[in-house]
């Protein structure tokens, strides 16, 4: 049975996507592609949305960084942005700002997940893998585990 709802125009569909959350230009173009006959149509809609301020790469980057910063490191967030077609020059400032809090964010994530320094090499490797898989650099992971050990030693003296 066919739906009685009218088909959304490309612009209407794009606005529906943007109302749900921010999108990169490339991501929105990919989502609109199945509904357009001509790629030039999509570009025209995206240009119009960008000119009117509905579509903004800077806002998209800020949104992703805000949503992901608590749980992920710079490398993982950067990879997500690149996979969505965000130009590298659009994310540089946001990721540089995020690097300044990388150690604190990794320590907080480690505290919530583990809370205790690793008891043996196997547990240390597990904690290391967890933080690395979240996109934190090996230097930051090493510092987090070293600080955890140091704090634990201080608490026991």
Swiss-Prot record:
InterPro entries: RecX_HTH_1st, RecX_HTH_2nd, RecX_HTH_3rd, Regulatory_RecX, WH-like_DNA-bd_sf. GO terms for cellular component: cytoplasm. The keyword Hydrolase does not apply. The keyword Cytoplasm applies. Belongs to the RecX family. It is found in: Cytoplasm. GO terms for biological process: regulation of DNA repair. Keywords: Cytoplasm. This is Regulatory protein RecX. The lineage of its organism: Bacteria, Pseudomonadati, Pseudomonadota, Betaproteobacteria, Burkholderiales. Modulates RecA activity.
